[in-house]
């Protein structure tokens, strides 16, 4: 099995190694096995390292995009090309270089998660039952419900721990020593067990590289939380990711403050005032629209079917259709503006609307339903075509030809 240099030194960025195996994974991928590596393989909820191998100063870099491990092999996945097959013969000496920016960020996230999980377990007895670390997000699942106050308290304690700059120690205890150690573990582990300890905070079984001291994490922020399978899922960001997220949100908050002429610490109150003002204006607008539609309905000439389109939706559609239905022998149909038209159809004189619904579904793909002389739903289509179809149905007593 490949010697795992990342187990010994998580800060090792470059190393020398020798090719001991080359495998065709599929048509596009080769698996390179070396005698030693600093590349961390995917595992423990964390994506693998990336980087490159170098044969010499002339040969182009061989990019490593993924690293996988099983009970027998640790393979670095590279492009299955003729050049790489020639360059990676058994015995070839390579110089490896990992993507340090990704590695260090991953270590910040993972070490921060250990502190978080240790504190949650100590305070509330909840277990970490799920962890996912990728370039897009970091999630931690606990088997108990954390309140907003709980999360704020935990976040504060995590950052206090980070700023104490405690040493993080990783080692493989003997089977005898292991019997006397209490540690966290999400699953049973076959083979040698590696423990990661943060003094007085957490001891957890873990295969991944970690920062050397908690101070290197910098900062942990819980950016989202939700109930999940009877417990709690937290989204966290640490270190550079936390700083970038905070900077982006601060920038957006600044823009909002400028638009609303509000201080950055008062944007919520400013938005709340704007929302209340908008709600009042919307309420007044609906009232005005309702009055105008009532006046409009008085000018409509009675017909077999009245089919109209208005720039409104919701209760206004129904209210206007109800007014028009008094003047329609068959029914009144009112549609909203736009391509995705909402509609309400009302019959007050016994005209059956089931055939109307059937025709709208088959001709225009409408999604609709109703009862008691009322049909409502939505469809996509040209209003003129819909109106012509409905007028034909009304004239023919319920069927369109």
Regions found by a protein language model. Give the residues of each.
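A glycine- and charged-residue-rich anion-binding loop/surface
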Residues: 1-401
